[in-house]
Amino acid sequence: MTKRQPLYKSLYVQVLVAITIGILLGHYYPETGVALKPLGDGFVKLIKMVIAPIIFCTVVSGIAGMQSMKSVGKTGGYALLYFEIVSTIALIIGLVVVNVVQPGAGMHVDVSTLNASSVAAYAAAGAQQTTVGFLLNVIPNTVVGAFANGDILQVLMFSVLFGFALHRLGSYGKPVLDLIDRFAHVMFNIINMIMKLAPIGAFGAMAFTIGQYGVGSLVQLGYLMACFYITCILFVLVVLGGICRAHGFSVIKLIRYIREELLIVLGTSSSESALPRMLAKMERLGAKKSVVGLVIPTGYSFNLDGTSIYLTMAAVFIAQATDTTMDITHQITLLLVLLVASKGAAGVTGSGFIVLAATLSAVGHLPVAGLALILGIDRFMSEARALTNLIGNAVATVVVAKWVKELDTDQLQAELASGGSPLVDTRPTDDLGVAEGPAR
């Protein structure tokens, strides 16, 4: 029988306490809270520092170790099919809820009185977002550039090609594969060290958020926030919960299993901050490395359920608040634009707002200056977006793995029943005594 870890050593408890202290400090000492922003930024940068090499190692090791290349194409095809269906459902749910509840009705905001300069940078960034540009951006100018910029899709593109090439070499490429596996062990050990700083990062980020924007900004547009949070909760419990039940597992148990990652995301407002740990945890949950390596990184651009809900709700809210007519034709057009635009949102803080700006620019019917209405509360809404995105990608990984018969269901049930013990304590060690990454 394993000795139970003391409560104060649990990362879950440490991050939760840090977030609470950050909220209190930001509220009562806002200037001090704002000054702590570098703590949150520094932690997120440390995580981003190792995301690219971890994705590379995971994807290459998974693909190169597969028996057949057909299974890679099958996994990718099923993943994209799942992403498109579920994210479309999320967009429609957001559209339905905002039309039924109408959180912006009665505000009668005059667009000419809004401070458009406050959102000019977002509008300019959004105007540059095009479908062709997005697709071309997946191809890196140089391999080094992809890793230097930390662009997930560019790194994924190169990693898949590298994995295919290494697989074709057969036994001749095995020394390279072994080297990559050992390099992965080093990267995951770095992640273990960085995660010890998670409470500090969450504390600094939350103190800054409350200190900068204040609790008062939550009250002003609280109706929209409440609608959005409730919609995200219902989406997770009803839609994702239904998908989980149909595939033989519980979404509640899955949420409990990834609770530490969810708290890290809550503190940083970026689902990207939990990506390295999610790669390891989903594999430990019973999904094969090849599936995890493809689904998780791709999902960070193509399966952002929380962002999809936010985009439709925010766009129609702006129309309602500014008394802009949105008939059925306009709303269908909005939905079609978002089906494409939502795929360009990465799992980083602020990306959803940029995609919203791009959508308003593309539709043309909605006032881009209306972004100023939700600029103050967007940072608070980003938590719900990031949490929903993370849960959605966890569900997608298990479901796709089951579809392609690359899921150990016994291991899945055992891990979910255990509640997910700390990742660092469950790693086996190799003959050098070094903690390993997930088994291939």
From Swiss-Prot:
Keywords noted in UniProt: Cell inner membrane, Cell membrane, Membrane, Symport, Transmembrane, Transmembrane helix, Transport
Q: What is its main location?
A: membrane
Region Disordered, as annotated, extends over: 419-440
Q: Which residues cross the membrane?
A: 15-35, 46-66, 78-98, 146-166, 190-210, 224-244, 291-311, 332-352, 354-374
Example GO CC term: the record gives: plasma membrane
Spell out the SUPFAM superfamilies in the cross-references. Answer: Proton glutamate symport protein
Q: Is Signal one of the keywords UniProt gives this record?
A: no
Bilayer topology annotation? Multi-pass membrane protein
Molecular function terms from GO: fumarate transmembrane transporter activity; malate:proton symporter activity; succinate transmembrane transporter activity
Q: Might you name a Gene Ontology BP term for this protein? A: L-aspartate transmembrane transport
List each coiled-coil range. Answer: none
Its localization reads:
Cell inner membrane
**Family note:** Belongs to the dicarboxylate/amino acid:cation symporter (DAACS) (TC 2.A.23) family.
What is the role of the protein in this entry? Responsible for the transport of dicarboxylates such as succinate, fumarate, and malate from the periplasm across the membrane.
Record-linked HAMAP family: C4_dicarb_transport
The name this protein goes by in its record: C4-dicarboxylate transport protein
